[in-house]
């Protein structure tokens, strides 16, 4: 796409999202924030973005992202439209190594309550989320696929499958389906034989997958509309489907827990406001409000001390002590340096 066409495309995207604006009465300046859309971004708006806009007295414009390729496209085109974007941790580290990010200004961004391992020169942890196996009870009753071996077992658990259309999480799921204990997944993937084993197992279910979804809002729509019967998707999205009245079951067992981070693309037009917004989004109360609105795991450990998260709600949060050890914590180091190669092989596999 020519540079001018790309600029127009990006501008059109922002116009399309102009309904998602948070504008204080006498706003001074603006910032453009992009995330994953759908009910998740609705929750971000009410719990975090609107309060931040009011506190900072700035206009917060919103857009949606489909991942690392969107950030790269803006930088390559010389048309950076986003000031802050949420991305998965491997993408954050990859973009950082590519020199595509502005450094985080820690004279503005307060890291109190944020684990040290989530504080990076060019990005910072934002939320913990888990992709779980969720199934419609009108198809399976109370006995749907509840682990990865059963997800792969179409003979005993027939039904339309949905999986994430990115390599992330799928190789891990394939190994667990093949009998590798959760705690040994990344040791197995550290070997050529282990990666080959994962590709082989993934290749067995790939032709049976009805939809390889691209975004979180799409996954919720697929489950809600019955276009899939069982799907690997974000547990927060599953909760939104349940809240809409659809009878769906899921569990954290064998879920893949990951961390999203916040970053500022190099060339951000509103860099100072970007840092100020990040600081607001990482505050303990903002993080707690999001967990109440949508049961995502806060990265700020102070969130559980605010009194905002009730005991009843806390057990639905993936980082709650009763849930944490049931899940596989995704290791970004497996992807860093080989994400492009793995993505290319994955895309070839699912397009066959």
Language-model region placement:
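Sec/Tat signal peptide C-region and signal peptidase I cleavage site
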Residues: 22-27
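Early extracytoplasmic/lumenal segment of secretory-pathway proteins
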Residues: 28-94, 220
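Extracytoplasmic ligand-binding site segments that recognize negatively charged/polar headgroups
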Residues: 38-43, 81-82, 86-220
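Periplasmic-binding protein-like
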Residues: 111-114, 129-131, 200-205, 242-268
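A bilobed periplasmic-binding-protein/Venus flytrap-type ligand-binding module shared by bacterial periplasmic
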Residues: 132-139, 175-177, 259-271, 289, ...
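Conserved C-terminal helix/tail region of periplasmic/extracytoplasmic solute-binding proteins
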Residues: 322-352
């Amino acid at each position: 796409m020519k540079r001018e066409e790309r600029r127009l495309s990006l501008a059109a995207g922002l116009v399309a999202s102009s309904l998602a604006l948070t504008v204080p009465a006498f706003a001074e300046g603006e910032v453009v924030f992009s995330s994953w859309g759908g009910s998740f971004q609705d929750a971000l708006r009410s719990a975090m973005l609107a309060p931040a806009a009011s506190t900072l007295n700035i206009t917060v414009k919103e857009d949606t992202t489909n991942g690392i390729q969107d950030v790269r496209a803006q930088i390559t085109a010389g048309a950076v439209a986003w000031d802050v974007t949420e991305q998965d941790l491997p993408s954050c580290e990859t973009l950082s190594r590519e020199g595509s990010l502005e450094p985080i200004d820690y004279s503005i961004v307060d890291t109190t309550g944020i684990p040290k391992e989530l504080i990076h020169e060019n990005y910072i942890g934002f939320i913990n989320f888990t992709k779980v196996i969720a199934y419609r009870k009108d198809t399976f009753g109370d006995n749907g696929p509840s682990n990865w071996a059963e997800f792969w077992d179409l003979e005993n658990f027939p039904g339309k499958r949905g999986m994430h259309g990115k390599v992330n999480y799928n190789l891990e799921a394939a190994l667990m389906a093949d009998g590798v204990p959760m705690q040994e997944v990344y040791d197995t993937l550290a070997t050529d034989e282990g990666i080959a084993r994962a590709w082989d197992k993934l290749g067995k279910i790939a032709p049976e997958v009805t939809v390889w979804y691209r975004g979180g809002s799409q996954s919720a729509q697929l489950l809600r509309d019955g276009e899939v019967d069982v799907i690997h998707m974000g547990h927060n999205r599953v909760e939104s489907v349940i809240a809409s009245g659809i009878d769906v079951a899921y569990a954290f067992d064998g879920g893949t827990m990951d961390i999203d981070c916040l970053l500022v693309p190099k060339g951000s037009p509103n860099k100072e406001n970007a840092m100020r917004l990040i600081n607001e989004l990482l505050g303990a109360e903002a993080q707690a409000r999001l967990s109440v609105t949508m049961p995502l795991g806060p990265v700020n450990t102070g969130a559980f001390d605010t009194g905002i998260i009730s005991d009843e709600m806390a057990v639905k949060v993936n980082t709650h002590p009763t849930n944490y050890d049931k899940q596989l914590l995704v290791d970004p180091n497996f992807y860093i340096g080989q994400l492009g190669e793995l993505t290319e092989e994955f895309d070839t596999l699912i397009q066959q």
